[in-house]
Amino acid sequence: MLSTITSFLILLFFVTTVSAYPFEENSFPRLQDTLATGTKPGDPPKFGGGYDYVVVGGGTTGLLVASRLAKAGNSVAVIENGTYPTGNLTTVPGYNEQWFSRVLPSNWTDMVNVWPTVQQVGGGEQQHMMGRMIGGSQGFTFVDYFRTTKGAMKRWADETGDDSWTWENVQQYYKKSFKFTPPNNTARPSNATPDYESSQIVGSTPGPLELTFPKYAQAFGSWVKLGLNELKAGINRVFVEGDIKGASWILNMIDSQTGNRATTYTAFLEPTQKDDTSKIDVYVETLAERTLSNTPPGSDPVTIGVLVKRWGMRFPIFAGKEVILAGGPILTPQFLMVSGIGPQDHLQEMNITVLANRPGVGQNYNDHILFGVKHAVQVETTSVLLNDTRKWQECERFKAHANGMLADPGPDFAAFVDYPEDIRQNLSAQTKSDLSQFPSDWPDIGIVSSPLGVNGDGNHNYADLVCIPMKPISKGTIKLRSKSMDDKPVLDPQWLKSPTDMDTAVAGLQYLLRLYGTNSMKPILNASGKPIDLESSNKDDLIKYVKNNYRTLNHQSASCRMGKRDDPMAVVDSKGKVIGVDRLRIADPSAWPFLPAGFPLGTAYMFAEKIADNILSDHGSDKDEDEDELRVEL
C-alpha cells in the first residue's frame, strides 16, 4: 500500500487519543466538494493589443509580478492557459488531500497540467503535477510557508556574483508580501502553541497576503513532536530566521477570518483587478506559443511580444517594455526552446531557428523527492472523513467557525535535521564528500508528520511519517518532443540516479523508523507496532522500499539557471534577464541557480518580489520611446 503523502507534498500536528472510527470500506469523501471553471466578466476580448508588460503564466509568481507592475502604473497582460477556479476544492485547506488521492475530482484535468517522465529509478514513469488555473498550484497544494538558510543565500550570491542575493539583502523581499495574524490559542490546543517572533516574519509595512496558523491542529503531529524531542532534534521558530534546523509547527498562508487559502490570486490579482487605477488584463484559456522578436543589425534579438492561441485563433500580444516568463520550471524552458532560445544542437534537431544559443536551457533540473512510512495509529486522522456523517459535521464546523479538520491542510508539524552520527557513519565515502559541499546550516533531511488517511483500508486511522532528502545530487533535463507548445516536453528528472541520493534516502528512512520506535510515539501505534509494508530494516529491503515508494515533491527548479553573464550554462543573469536576448526575463523558480534548503514556496514569493523590484528599477513607469517602432517592424 503506497502512502498517501508519498504521492505529493508536505506537513502536520496535535494530541488526544481516540478510538478507531467505523469507516466505510474504500469510500471517499463526497459531501460539499465542488470544483468548476469560469471566465470572469472583466476578461479581455479575443484579440490582444499592446501593453507595457506581458506576463506568461498566471500562477504564484506571475500574478505577484503582474500586480506589482500594474500597481506602479504600467499596463499588464497576463497569459494563462487555464482559467479561473471556482468551488471549494481550491479554497478549503483540508481538501488538498483529494488532489493526491486515488479518486481525483471529476473535472480535475481542466485545472491541472500532468507531465509524465521517462522511466526512472525503480522502473516505470512518474508524473509531475502543476496547477493549470489562475493562481497556479496554490489552488491545491499545501499552504505551508518556509524560508531557506543564510548559507543557501550566500551560495546564491556567490554563484551569481551579486551580493543583493545574500540573506541580509533579501529579507525585505521575504517579508514584503505578507501580513501576520498570531495563532488563535483559544481554538488551538495548549500543546500546539508555536514559538515565533513576529518581527522575523513580517516587516513594519504589512503586505496583502496573510500568514497565520490554522485554528485546528491534527493530533498526530504533537506525538511526532514528542518523538523528535526524544531524538534531540531541537526547536525552531517557524523556519523563517535563516537557520531551519530543529522542529516547529508550520506557518500557513490562510485567511484567518474565513479559514480559506490565501494566494496571489486572492491577495494580489483580485484587488488589482478591482482597482480602477490599475490596468491589468488576464487572458485565460490562452496558450503562449512563442516569443515575437526583432533582431537589429549587430545586436541581440529584442523581444516585442508573444504569439498566442485562444479559442482556435492566433494573434500577437505586444510588450513595449518586457515579456516576463512565469510558467514554471517545466513550461518556461519549453517555451524558451520553441522560441529559439536554448541548446543549439537540440533546437536544430527540432527544426527550430536558433535565436540565442543558451546550452543551459532545460538542464540542471532540481527537485526534491519524498517517501513516507504509513502506520495505523490510535488518534484521529483524516481517515475519519471517509464517514459521510463525520465529513458533513466537519464541513459545517468549517463554514460556521473556520475551524475543524478541514481548516488544517493536514501536515502541520515538521523538522529539519542532520543524520545522527551512527547513521552518518554508514554512508559511503563519496556520499560524505558530496554532502560536505553544502553549507553547514543546510540540513540533511526534512521530516514531516502527515495524518492523511483517506487512502487507508477503511478500518483504522492511518498516518505517515515522511522524509524529504534535502541535498539531492542528481540533476535532470527537459527536452522538446516537438516544436509545438501543445506537445508535452520530454522530462527526465533523474531522481536517485546518483548513488549518493540513494545512500542519503536510505539513511533518511532509517531515521523515520527510529522516530517511530521512540518511547514517546509508542502509545499511539497499533498493537503490532510495525509500519505498513515494511517488514525488514536490512539495507537491501530499505533500498527496495525507497525505489517502490518515492515520489516527487513537485519542487522543480533551476531548469533555466541564474548565473554570471560569462557562464556559458547560465540562462539568466542575477536580475532574471535572459542572456543574449533583450527585454525577456524569467520570474519563476526555473531561474534559480539551485533548489535551496527547506521547502521553496516562501523563497518563490521572495524571488518574485525581488524580480518585480528589479524590473521597476530598470524601467520605472514611463513608456518606452521605441515601443511603436518595434511593433511596426514586426
Residue ranges and their predicted role:
Residues 3, 7-634:
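N-terminal redox-cofactor-binding region of secreted/periplasmic oxidoreductases
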